[in-house]
Regions:
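PIN-domain endoribonuclease scaffold, especially VapC-family toxins
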Residues: 1-56, 80, 85-88
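C-terminal structural segments of small proteins and small subunits
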Residues: 60, 64, 68-73
Length: 88
């Protein structure tokens, strides 16, 4: 659905996203990316390239990844994951 007020939608989106930190894909994340990709390839359990980027950034920053995509991210060794749909 296209908005009739794209400027307003963009402003609201920016307000929402400003509440969160954005972590970069830096050298540490690139190293993690290679390590994870090689490990998963050796075990025949690859994950999608975007999920691989997300996992690498989380590991490089020692961050907990909050997701409902447990099937993919459970394959990544050392990654701390929380399912946002599971009650605490």
């Amino acid at each position: 659905m296209k908005s009739t007020q794209p400027a307003k939608v963009l402003t609201e989106q920016r307000k929402f996203l400003d509440q969160f930190a954005s972590l970069p894909f830096d050298d540490r994340a690139a190293d993690e990316y290679g390590r994870i990709r090689a490990h998963l390839a050796r075990h025949g359990t690859p994950i999608g390239p975007n999920d691989l980027l997300i996992a690498a950034i989380a590991l490089a920053n020692n961050a907990t990844l909050v997701t409902h995509n447990m099937a993919e991210f459970n394959r990544v060794p050392g990654l701390t994951i929380t399912d946002w749909e599971t009650p605490a």
